[in-house]
Amino acid sequence: MNAPERIDPAARCANALRFLAADAVELARSGHPGAPMGMAEMAEVVWRRHLRHNPANPAWPDRDRFVLSNGHASMLQYALLHLTGYDLPMSQLRQFRQLHAVTPGHPEVDVTPGVETTTGPLGQGLANAVGMALAEKLLAATFNRPGFDIVDHHTYVFLGDGCLMEGLSHEACSLAGTLGLGKLICLYDDNGISIDGEVAGWFADDTPKRFAAYGWHVIADVDGHDAHALDAALHEAKAERDRPTLICCRTVIGKGAPAKAGGHDVHGAPLGAPEIAAMRTALGWEAEPFTVPADVADAWDARAQGAAREAEWEARFVSYCAAHPELAEEFVRRANGRLPEGFDAELMALLDAPSPLQGKIATRKASQLCLEALTPALPELLGGSADLTGSNLTNVKASVWVNHAGHGNYVSYGVREFGMAAVMNGIALHGGLIPYGGTFMTFSDYSRNAIRMAALMRLRVVHVLTHDSIGLGEDGPTHQPVEHAASLRLIPNNQVWRPCDGAETAYAWLAALQRENGPTCLVLSRQALMPFERDAAQRADIARGGYVLRDVPAPRVVLIATGSEVEIAARAALDLADAGIAARVVSMPCVELFYAQDAAYRDSVLPPGLPRISVEAGATWYWRGVVGEQGLALGIDSFGESAPAEALYQHFGLTPAHVAAAARVLLEDA
């Protein structure tokens, strides 16, 4: 056994991480000890020697960001947060992976103090970090002035082989290199092991050359267990201002475990009591489980240093306030996520007076008109598109493409839908900006897991999804969404708006921007749609997600529709009126929001006992819960076809005549 006093202090700090991780996984009988043990030296060097943070204030705006992209190594992060002084007591490390503990199996933002993003789906943390670094660069260009670098921090990422195998890593890292995100520093845990074994059989990439081709600064072949080599690499990385840096760290998974280090068995299972005991002997670690020696605890404690660093920044910010009061006020507003007073005034003016927004218009074009009105009042809006700007209509006259220097308010993400969605999550997590990005709705499948993560993290992110149905016509079934609206509605805490005209589109944008606790998907048409007149009460009720658009005395049936099919339902109601059948028309642009209303309001719109028919150019099964067993869901339960839109609507029975006929049959059978 090595005597503790003879072991290098930095090595003892790293070993504290190893044992906290191994002991917590052992107690939980669940978890991943190998990666935390293998990255212990990397973590010691980054967190004790480079990371600028204040454990007493995890929300300090100019803190460095740390992202554990290989989120299965969560016990490494929890050990770091506990040791450096965050509000994470040892009792919570003992509760690792237990119900309601703040130490869940994978890191979750807003659950554990100091965790910057929720990670676990490999590669997404890396893409989030790209978004954070992009946000830092854009905000620095906006707010910094000579002598006042109030936005000046790095984003550090730990990532593994799995992150780099995910295609998302290509999308995000290619973009990061193109945009020159010089304050993004990634440390690659190159241990050569994944769940199935040695990765050489399925991951033989030359990673340094790959990242050099992206335009990254690459520091290759660093011993991931040599603190001096790691420290030198990090100093070199921080000196690079124009390119992101990848530090390739050769590591041994499960480092320190006498019998299991270097093998895939240590990846995702407890080491076992005998192996941990042998490790204690081999590393000269005499402390009991969940006990940290005083000298190690003192060496890790970052509270005093963190407070001093934030105090220095605060003093600089006070001077900044005096020199640039308007900029300082704007910085505080945006950092706190507050929308400016009256930001919606110009948009509301478009609804109060004759304007193109009130005419026959595609809702994608209506969305662009909304953005034209909103962008001057909301400098925090950061737009973008996955190479479909001219189709999504996500740009406005005030759009300036983001460039290498960090100026602009519009990102050309390229054909990178998943990358765009995950990068936008990182932008939202950073704060100070509200990202929105566009693609065709059928390609939302590429983005889906990042949309899910935004919902889980409760992020204000807006997805502009155009060409929302068979209404796009001749491009055919590869581009015609069918199941997508229903699928997106199934994501908890995700709001899906499918507006029927300019007014509903405006309210959809307002709802998306005012929603601070989750993402919004705006599902928009390619084709022009008929506008509807509304009184003040109806217009206000748009914000409730569903409302009575056209009513009649003593209705016998309720027609419920969204988007382009609202016009079909309204015309069907007229046909039914000619046949002596009174039909109420309900527009339901946001089903989730409607069902969040109180029961009295819902019943006033959809009276119990009245037969219901839903009309939406998409999968019908979602609507069966709305119309009930006695109702009828009209839509499309197959893939589309290549043809003009008018022919497709006729082919699939989505016409006023078909809807009216279905209503008559339903009433006859009732």
UniProtKB/Swiss-Prot annotation:
Pathway(s) where this gene product acts: Carbohydrate biosynthesis; Calvin cycle
Requisite cofactors: Mg(2+); Ca(2+); Mn(2+); Co(2+)
Residues reported to bind substrate: H32, H267, R364, S391, H467, D475, R526
Site (Important for catalytic activity): H32, H267
EC number: 2.2.1.1
PROSITE patterns assigned: TRANSKETOLASE_1, TRANSKETOLASE_2
GO terms for MF: metal ion binding; transketolase activity
Keywords assigned: Calcium, Calvin cycle, Magnesium, Metal-binding, Plasmid, Thiamine pyrophosphate, Transferase
Catalysed transformations (reactions): D-sedoheptulose 7-phosphate + D-glyceraldehyde 3-phosphate = aldehydo-D-ribose 5-phosphate + D-xylulose 5-phosphate
Positions that bind thiamine diphosphate: H72, G120, P121, L122, G162, N191, H267, F443
GO cellular component terms, A-Z: cytosol
Cofactor annotation comment: Binds 1 Mg(2+) ion per subunit. Can also utilize other divalent metal cations, such as Ca(2+), Mn(2+) and Co(2+).
SUPFAM superfamilies reported for this sequence: Thiamin diphosphate-binding fold (THDP-binding) (SSF52518), TK C-terminal domain-like (SSF52922)
Protein family membership: Belongs to the transketolase family.
Quaternary structure and partners: Homodimer.
Function, in words: Catalyzes the transfer of a two-carbon ketol group from a ketose donor to an aldose acceptor, via a covalent intermediate with the cofactor thiamine pyrophosphate.
Full protein name: Transketolase, plasmid
Organism: Cupriavidus necator (strain ATCC 17699 / DSM 428 / KCTC 22496 / NCIMB 10442 / H16 / Stanier 337)
Gene name of the record: cbbTP
